[in-house]
Amino acid sequence: MPLQNLTPPPHTQIQDNKSLKQNSKQENKDENNVQNPEFKAYELEAVTIEAPTFGEYQKYQTGQVLDNKMLESAPSGNGDITSILRTLPNVQFDNSQLKSTTPGEIDPANISISGGLYYQNNFQLDGFNMNNDLNPLGSAIGGTRADSTTVSNTPGRSQGLNIDTSLLESITVLDSNIGAAYGGFTGGVVEANTRRPKKDFGASINYQISQGNANPNAFSLTQYKIPQEDLNSFLNSSNSAQQPHFIKHSFRSSIESKINDKLGIIASFTTMQSFIYLNAGDSEYLKNTLEGIKKTQKRQSYNFFIKGNYDYSDTLSLELSYAYAPQYNNYFLAGVKDSGFDFLTGGHQLGLKSQKLNALGLLSTQASFSYMDSSRTNSENYFAYWRPSAEKNWTVDKSATQTYKWPQEGGYGNIDQKQINMNLKTQQDFEALQTSILTHNFSVGAEFGYVNAYYERVKDFWWGSYYNLHPLKQGQSCLDSDRFCSASPVYFQGTYSGESWANNIGQFVGYGSMYKKGKIALDSVTLGGFLQDDIRVDLSKAGTINARAGLRLDYDTYMSKATLAPRLSLNYIAPWSAWEYGKNFGTQITFGANRYYGRNLFAYRLADGQSALEYGISRSTPGAWSYESHRSTTNFQKIKVPYSDELMAGISQEVYMFALNLKYIVRKGRDEVRRMCADANGNLLASSSECKWAETNYTARYIYTNEGRSDSDILSIMFGNEAPIKLGAMDNFFMLSYDRTNIYRNYTDFNTDITQAELNNEMIYYEGIGFIKLADKPGSNFGQPITFRLSTTHVFPFYKTKWSMNNFFRIRSAYNAMARIEKNSRLYPDKVMQYNGVPVDTYIKFKVPWTFSWDMRFGVDVNVWRGNTLSLAVDIFNLLDTTNMYLLSGDYGRASGSPMYETGRQFWISVGYKY
């Protein structure tokens, strides 16, 4: 089905009908007539408050909607709500999202909307926020961070809940000219709206499978793109950053009932399961003392959902919903005994909505509670290195002197991170106030929220360092409770660091760290409100002017900052748009000037104090430890709230059933958050490494500042049909889009350390551009310069079957990935450019070629008996198995500067049954 445009809905959805009274009857008439709640009229006595219908021109070119039919017909893959947004312009993905080395992952994709950072979008489920503000930077699960996660940190993701699209009626993406009802973003708003019950009784079940095996002689539904010289090491991978063999299972089910004209209930259960088969360790490790030669890592996502709708009267409607969406990602540390652990994300969300027609118009109120996790569980509370011995024997090099060959065991300990939110929102939409040529539609809203976020190390964790392993000598013994002492003689009999291991009877750890159990917590109260007037000026034969002016106020006790965000959108509708013979050629012109304030993440505060839980431990003989306390490496201080100023202009043109939309967006992000290493007086230090060891050696501390900035300009064009093109009995829809994106940002994310050069905005050399200021350097990710997209849907009924095919074609332009050479480089001094005789940081380009992909879904629905439908479908990603390269910018000569490849052709096969 076609993509749709819309004017931004209020915080709380209005009913899907012209009046609350008509709701049940209308839904029973046509279960497929799904419309966005805002775009229907509601009646109160003789007064009618109207808004554009779902298919009308959007007044302010705010965004797009993917409706239920688009969600069902498009290739779904993992089924997360962001991956399917690849069909939309103004939405950019992480360069490495489709990488061929990690096809077994199931986490939702990170997206940038209109140049914003991926963790500065506002994700909502039925109007309730589901943002992860604990630590969204940890989203690189399946990359290098997963197996080498630090002792104190855990991965996260930008979305608090991983919601499956099978639950949804629509996904709304707001990317510009966003009304004052929305706050807490500098990117965009993604609103997932769940389905309502429509049938007297209905049920559905669906199973989907995909798998991959990189072994050239094995059956595989997934084609890997691995360089031949890397294939052998990839096939023997023991690291989740390289996944040569996986299988995915998806199970989806739902049940619904319109019990009567007033009450309806819908419930669903979905799960996505991925099993990734890896070696327990590389060739340096014996496997017989581990759990087995092969180990299986798991990714398991669950969605439990129930929602009830109750029309209490003609003027009052209630909706209650509950979602439980946990995800368990299981890992192990390669070659490390007893090292399994889980990352737990997701959680609970409970919401209640009411909609009341009153004397003023429509009053919408909603209350919600959410409980979200970002925790590490099931991990051992110790980690130890050992020299090889009869007891510590899981290494092939019995006399190993290199520490990476030494036996290791244990995990990093359990960490409990929670984000608990309670929110209350209310909004009054007033009945229209009309004069001779003016019509005012006022809206006012208020919000109250409370959040408790905390980081807790559940138990004491002990780390035994390889720096100070000592021989256990004659007359010494190990205590039974001492995990860091072994009475098994070590094979090594030489001398190390002046200490003889001859005739040893074992070994013990003499130095390490103890991370004491403890909790770091914060509470924050948020207040918000907005006022908005949507004005219509009827100029008769000269057309119509619409103006939406709004003001949004937000305050929170976390940063103790109040922000005031003006929003202004203007729209002109040409006069012929209303003529009998001109309405098929309607024209609209749109302008906008808006400010959006983002969110300050709780990670800034929770980082302060984590390293203070660490104690240095040491001993010269087996027995008691001596302790040395450490200080925090981060000093939290209140900072400003990041914001983005937006200017936009657009034009919409209708030609019969076709619509052309052109939009140009300019955004300037300021006061954006990044990290710096500072001395006790807050002055920038020359090297951020001074902060990494601040717990013992320095008074240096990491601090978060508002030195980040960005500039974006995006041009997008969309053209498609709003009604089906009939070819016999076949309905055909298509949507063609183009976007051109330029993003300039002086950092990557909030943990990117500031350098003195950046603070001074020094000159750099950027190959292909020349000498520029550092702040003018193009962004290195989420900024594909040019993208063409074509989406087509074809539906053909035949006898008792319905055949459907969806195609999605995407062409992405070539781009330059940049490798940096520092101005004082000793390895490549001949490549460093000079500006006025002074060496400057030099960025060397690597040309990444154009890429093409074709994704397809082909399905058939068979009416087997009285509306009982059997469904079969095949999803094919990268149908032509093209080799698409990507490259992450990094330092010159490093691995990050090596080309990588996206996944090749991949099949998903599904079967379902619906009643």
Give, region by region, the residue ranges found by the protein language model.
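Periplasmic N-terminal accessory/gating domains of Gram-negative outer-membrane beta-barrel systems
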Residues: 21-36, 48-50, 54-179, 189, ...
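Transmembrane beta-barrel wall of Gram-negative outer-membrane proteins
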Residues: 202-204, 240-328, 344-360
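Structural signature of Gram-negative outer-membrane beta-barrels, strongest in the C-terminal barrel
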Residues: 441, 447-451, 517-657, 664-666, ...
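Gram-negative outer-membrane beta-barrel transporters
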Residues: 539, 663-821, 912-914
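N-terminal periplasmic accessory domains that precede
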Residues: 111, 157-162, 173, 185-209, ...
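Short loop/turn motifs that connect adjacent beta-strands in outer-membrane beta-barrel proteins
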Residues: 40, 180-182, 197-203, 255-263, ...
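C-terminal beta-signal and adjacent terminal beta-strands/loops
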Residues: 675-677, 799-804, 808-834, 849-853, ...
